Amino acid sequence: MTDRAMSYPRILADVGGTNVRFAMETAPMRIGEITAYKVAEHASLEAAMRLYMLTRSGAARPRHAAIGLANPVTGDQVKLTNHNWAFSVEAMRRALDLDTLVAINDFTSLALALPYLPDASLVQVRDGTAVATAPRALIGPGTGLGVSGLIPAPGGAVALAGEGGHIEIMPVTDDEWIAWRAAHDQFGRVSAERLLSGMGLSHIHAALSAEMGTPLEVPLAPAQVTDGAMRAGDPVCRRAFDAFCGMLGSVAADVALVLGARGGVYLGGGIVPRFVDALRASTFAERFVAKGRMGSFLADVPVYVITAEYPALPGLARALADRLEADARRAETSQS
């Protein structure tokens, strides 16, 4: 195992639909030099990473990097779902003169980060007692809807890589049905992400406005809907917000049931941390256990909101360390 193979610093990049956040890991889990760029302001991820490498203060050249992407990562070729960036992981590694470039789904990296998040960055919004040896579920509305889980396994926990945000969603209340039907008329199939995301919150509000006979020429931005619900006392914004929280409770419970997540459910993404108190006061917790015969299974499952500003970065560091250790073991085996 060479010094270069395990060297620091290492670049970490968390790529969302709106922003890309770069950081430098200078020692195990020592993460700093965090810089955020707007995705729309850069022609490619490679260009954004080059800019970050040019502007960082450290003298040592990074040899290894990990990127988390709000996108399925199933091979070398990557095309972002919510932006026009597309690239080959291997070609970008060579272009940036890196020894290692790991690409994983952003919610896979966030799941890997769960054991490293301090208690101060977690706000419990539903009572319960986590079972330390049980799976944990992760769901997060943002530009899209991320879903993952952390599953205990021999040798360390395994983070799931999937696209659970695109499962079907089942409305319950009248307002939810109004939003669902409007989405169905527009898109055909209605995934959970269509309603449980930033664009989903805007869509719910627009659908309710149209149902009331006051269609909008331009939908409100998600922040406008939440502001209208919590501060301005707008009744349509309030109904949209309530529908959003109720459906989030239902879908979070579905993910918990699939994974057997007695280790807790974690809410990430860029939306929910903005209204933690309002989520507590909503129907989220009620809908979380409204699962018929399985309500008793969910009754003691705690739910936490992740409030850390850059929560996925420790998970990227973990994924990169795991890859380097695996590569080193393979190299040692081939030489023996």
Swiss-Prot record:
Keyword ATP-binding: yes
Gene Ontology MF terms in the entry: ATP binding; D-glucose binding; glucokinase activity
Subcellular location, record wording: Cytoplasm
Family annotation (Gene3D superfamilies): 3.30.420.40, 3.40.367.20
EC number, as in UniProt: 2.7.1.2
Keywords of this entry: ATP-binding, Cytoplasm, Glycolysis, Kinase, Nucleotide-binding, Plasmid, Transferase
InterPro entries on file: ATPase_NBD, Bacterial_glucokinase, Glucokinase
Name of a matching Pfam family: Glucokinase
CC annotations in GO: cytosol
A GO BP entry: glycolytic process
EC class of the enzyme, as a word: transferase
Reaction equation(s) it catalyzes: D-glucose + ATP = D-glucose 6-phosphate + ADP + H(+)
Superkingdom of this protein's organism: Bacteria
Binding positions for ATP per the UniProt entry: 13-18
Family: Belongs to the bacterial glucokinase family.
Protein name per its UniProtKB record: Glucokinase
Highest classification ranks of the organism: Bacteria, Pseudomonadati, Pseudomonadota, Betaproteobacteria, Burkholderiales
Record gene name: glk
